[in-house]
A protein has these predicted regions:
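Short amphipathic alpha-helical interaction segments
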Residues: 63-81
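Long, low-complexity, charged/polar intrinsically disordered regions in eukaryotic proteins
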Residues: 1-35
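Short, cationic-aromatic polyanion-contact patches
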Residues: 90-100
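Short acidic, hydrophobic short linear motifs in intrinsically disordered regions
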Residues: 43-63
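Short acidic, glycine/proline-enriched loop segments that cap or flank alpha-helices
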Residues: 40-41, 60-67, 84
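Short amphipathic alpha-helical elements of helix-turn-helix/winged-helix folds
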Residues: 32-40, 52
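A short, conserved structural fragment
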Residues: 80-90
Length: 100
């Protein structure tokens, strides 16, 4: 992986760019989240998403290391910004639903 092979994360709460993360980590976490929400309309409480995603990660870990909770949260926010996921309105605690 090239040193500059990073992807810019976006935060839907601010509409602004957030951190940049390694593309390999992004791809692995995004895939794990989508596997945890296998169909359009699938939903899961956010507090359960990190464990559900972790079960779909290679060896249950972030490739190259890192906090599963941090990466799942960061990638989930980016996926909300991109319209792949959405928060279910009126649900407390937060529930996340697959849109695409």
């Amino acid at each position: 992986m090239a040193a500059d092979d990073k992807i810019q994360m976006w935060n839907p709460n601010t509409g602004r760019p957030d951190v940049k993360i390694d593309r390999a980590k992004f791809d692995a976490v995004r895939k794990a989240i989508l596997q945890a929400l296998p169909r359009k309309g699938s939903a899961i409480p956010f507090k359960e998403l990190p464990l559900a995603a972790e079960l779909n990660l290679p060896d249950g870990q972030i490739p190259g290391g890192g906090s599963v909770m941090w990466y799942v949260t960061t990638v989930k926010l980016h996926m909300e910004h991109e319209g792949e996921l959405e928060r279910v309105a009126g649900e407390t605690p937060q529930v996340v639903r697959r849109v695409k």
